[in-house]
Amino acid sequence: MNNLTLSLHRERRLLVLLGLVCLALLAGALYLQYVKNEDPCPLCIIQRYFFVLIAVFAFIGAGMASGAGIAVIEALIVLSAAAGVGTAARHLYVQLNPGFSCGFDALQPVVDSLPPAHWLPGVFKVAGLCETVYPPIFGILLPGWALIAFALIVVPVAASLLRHRGRLR
């Protein structure tokens, strides 16, 4: 095996790991929803969509054989995670500024009208308000943890893209 083959093999394994981590984060959100009775708000659901999108892209990328294909998938992962950073930051802002609303009435119908909300309402249906603050985990609010997770996805995947930018040729 040459270095490029080894690099692609390692990259694909890391993409599988990333997909599994995103699914584990979604499982954690469902645990909080159903066991701890912490209802998801519109911004929570949007963050779930981004974690699912990242997982889907990661699993697709793990099945690709070409470096250029993996690079395109990694770019989609970076875009999804960056959008997740923005959503989580907005959610954190809403929770840290009492009296400020996420626009529950405006966002809920939009989020609830998306097809996955009809296919899997237990996962993607809005049931709470964005300004509801649930007990922090290790001193960090839930949107803060989502922000950290999305940032920890953006940075290494973007670094991988930059490190392997020759694959696009």
From Swiss-Prot:
Gene3D superfamilies: DsbB-like (1.20.1550.10). Keywords: Cell inner membrane, Cell membrane, Chaperone, Disulfide bond, Electron transport, Membrane, Oxidoreductase, Redox-active center, Transmembrane, Transmembrane helix, Transport. It is a multi-pass membrane protein. Residues 1-14, 65-71, 164-169 are cytoplasmic. Disulfide bonds join C41-C44, C102-C130. Residues 32-49, 90-144 are periplasmic. It is found in: Cell inner membrane. The keyword Cell inner membrane applies. The chain crosses the membrane at residues 15-31, 50-64, 72-89, 145-163. Its main location: membrane. One of its GO terms (biological process) is protein folding. GO terms for cellular component: plasma membrane. The keyword Cell inner membrane applies. One of its GO terms (molecular function) is protein-disulfide reductase activity. Pfam families: DsbB. Belongs to the DsbB family. Required for disulfide bond formation in some periplasmic proteins. Acts by oxidizing the DsbA protein. This is Disulfide bond formation protein B. It comes from Burkholderia thailandensis (strain ATCC 700388 / DSM 13276 / CCUG 48851 / CIP 106301 / E264).
